[in-house]
Amino acid sequence: MQDFLEFQSISKGYPGVQALSEVSFSVRKGAVHGLMGENGAGKSTLIRVLSGDQAADTGEIRINGEPQHYRSVRDAFNAGVIVIHQELQLVPELTVAENLWLGRFPGKAGVIDRRQLIRVVSDRLAEIGIDVDPEAKVASLSIGERQMVEIAKAVMTDARVIALDEPTSSLSSRESEILFALIDRLRSNGTVILYVSHRLDEIFRLCNSLTVLRDGRLAAHHPDISKVGREQIIAEMVGREISNIWGWRARTLGAARLTVERVSGANLPQPISFTVRAGEILGFFGLIGAGRSEMARLVYGADRRRQGKVLVDGLAVPADSPRLSIRAGVVLCPEDRKFDGIVQGRSIEENMAISSRRHFSPFGVVDKGKEAELAERFIAKLRVRTPSRHQDIVNLSGGNQQKVILGRWLSEEGVKVLLIDEPTRGIDVGAKSEIYEILYELAAQGMAIVVISSELPEVMGIADRILVMCEGRIAAEIDRSDFDEHRILAAALPDASATTATLPEQVS
């Protein structure tokens, strides 16, 4: 089958960084083409060039043999190119239907026919297999539901080329299966799919071919993915072999550091209880909607508690106040780091120092020298890849943004408990191992760590103990010596947890 999408010698640089250098590869019509690489390898830059969001310094993109000269995202859209970014492009205050039909509403003489709009959108969503209320405000949807709306928007435009950037990072298993079925349908219709993911299982399941980028250059191009193995791809991504990505090792655990006693809230009505020992990494696993993130927000004080107590080293942590939780030694790295974790438009230095400024801001005046010293120290310690501490944090890869958030809390004096939600979502295999090493180092220093993840291999790989959540309650407690994938998944499923789970003693 003929080449339909071609990248020819694409180069793109920013001040202090060469993001892409002479990248060339092609994709056949009707193919699903994987794009992999470590964070910072150049994948997102290449996608931005394809989408018309940014222009390449040199090189050319061809679609069906025709050179493309985009000046804007609109130009790319008109050429049949749609990119679904990790940072969703929906308008929160508009409804699902309005977002899906934005700019092309049905009606006459400028008057929108809303009944026709709802009818058309309902029919198309049902046809695609997406169960979302077309009249619901996007702001009211979960992250996974918003992702499905974004995907539906691309499918409903009859695009010739669709690029998906980590599309399943916020999806449940059921939603992912719907997406995979859509991709198969688009493939059969001749649409080119550029599939950016760090999940090798998805790459091997969906893709016909694969390109690997490393440090802005073409590391490998595989026209037939069936002829390449996982270990080879990982080595091509990181430039070295990673024999054990998890790197777990036993540690000496201390006394109970974090104690949660019958805590509940509006979004987690059933009271839950658990303890985490000093030096322990406790994993929380469950399906989307199981209540994992809600638990973390209650413990941290971001959501209001209805009842219960949180104690650190036996001392009560005041309820409903992140500020007081931080002072008590409890910190949270949130699930959605783009919106809840980083301060967009601010530098790495400012993001790292934001929680510690009171320590070097006498009389309300920030000591910029101490702030710079702190940033440089943690950039080096956490191996943040950046040309300067002054760089805008939005220009960092996901893995480096996560390191900056960790650096923010490590710079805070007296942190005893770290709650980290989806620690490696959208992060490449090399950066994942670096994040895990940071967590192991913190645990070895006596910190109690709670890791919340929807990736079962991750939880099983790094946790000393796992609590499985199902429908807002703790359904099972499993020690590392008893880890079993089938048992954990069975406990996470609503129809199975009641008969297969072993409840922890702490739960009343």
Curated annotation (Swiss-Prot):
It comes from Rhizobium meliloti (strain 1021). Belongs to the ABC transporter superfamily. Arabinose importer (TC 3.A.1.2.2) family. The gene is araG. This is Arabinose import ATP-binding protein AraG. The keyword Membrane applies. Its EC number is 7.5.2.12. Transmembrane segments: none annotated. Part of the ABC transporter complex AraFGH involved in arabinose import. Responsible for energy coupling to the transport system. Its main location: membrane. It is a peripheral membrane protein.
